[in-house]
């Protein structure tokens, strides 16, 4: 009997000591679920940023094949390297359970470039991908940096914004150098 009482006391003690851990686990699970539910502006940013980077990377691969201009090829290489890094940073900043699309390039932009070669390609690439693409990216990153609800995504946008702004300036300089309007 005495051993049953000791056993019951030990069991009750173990159950009571486990209760806070169970409550903590439930609280953590609830907060993880809340973190996974991004607000609309953050979801839009993840989509826009991943599409921008995917398009930059894919269009820059085209530029490395279809352009004959050294400056355009150098710009394209720079964009491939930087946007690969930016995509990785975005994936690391996204909350657990939020998928950053791997390859969601803007097919309309890519399709408009595929049939072009030489100077015709260079002009379209500089206009659509270099200048216009980076203007849109700057807007998306600025909006997230100012209005984002998810702290990690907001911080990632703030960190990446100077790079995106530098890309826009590089594209504008390249456009001026090549006489692209």
Specify the residue positions occupied by each region the protein language model found.
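His/Met- and acidic-residue-enriched segments that coordinate or traffic transition-metal cofactors
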Residues: 2-10, 16-181
């Amino acid at each position: 009997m005495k051993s049953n009482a000791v056993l019951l006391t030990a069991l009750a003690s173990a159950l009571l000591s486990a209760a806070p851990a169970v409550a903590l686990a439930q609280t953590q699970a609830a907060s993880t679920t809340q973190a996974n539910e991004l607000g609309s502006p953050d979801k839009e940013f993840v989509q826009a940023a991943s599409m921008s980077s995917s398009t930059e990377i894919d269009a820059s691969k085209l530029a490395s094949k279809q352009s004959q201009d050294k400056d355009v090829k150098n710009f394209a290489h720079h964009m491939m390297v930087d946007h690969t890094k930016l995509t990785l940073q975005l994936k690391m900043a996204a909350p657990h359970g939020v998928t950053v699309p791997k390859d969601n390039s803007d097919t309309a932009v890519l399709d408009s470039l595929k049939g072009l070669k030489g100077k015709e390609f260079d002009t379209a690439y500089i206009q659509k991908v270099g200048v216009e693409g980076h203007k849109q990216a700057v807007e998306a990153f600025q909006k997230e940096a100012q209005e984002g609800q998810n702290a990690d995504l907001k911080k990632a946008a703030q960190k990446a914004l100077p790079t995106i702004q530098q890309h826009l300036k590089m594209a504008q300089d390249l456009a001026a150098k090549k006489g692209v309007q």
